[in-house]
């Protein structure tokens, strides 16, 4: 089966293989009803800012990944997708209380990556939380094709500093479920 480079459901998706993609997954029910209708007049960039601010505010919907075990499960699955499954090369990620930001160079089609990771983490998290028959993740993702190195650096900074911006930690590397924490650990190991 050939991977689709472009398709639309509720949101447009550009997903060329071998390109860097900025992806956001959110928990089901994490945005207030009518959120997208209120954003129809905004540009794509302004829609994303409103989307991310609403998620970071933590005022709507479930916050399953506030639970350290669930956040670790998702974080470990993201790393496993890179190191063991070879689905992508991960450049940055963060697991927040109700959403995940991920920056990858896709080796496999994004549809496959999303299906495998969201499916696995949903099953495991729902089992851990003693939930059955309920959606864990929203069925669609926000994704953006990163087009140049300046945008790449800006997005890495944005992702890794999301917990700081949300007021959860003072320093990005203090958030355990992010690539910033991994970078700090690797630096410490190299110094030793």
Residue spans for each PLM region:
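Short catalytic/metal-binding and nucleic-acid-binding patches
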Residues: 1-192
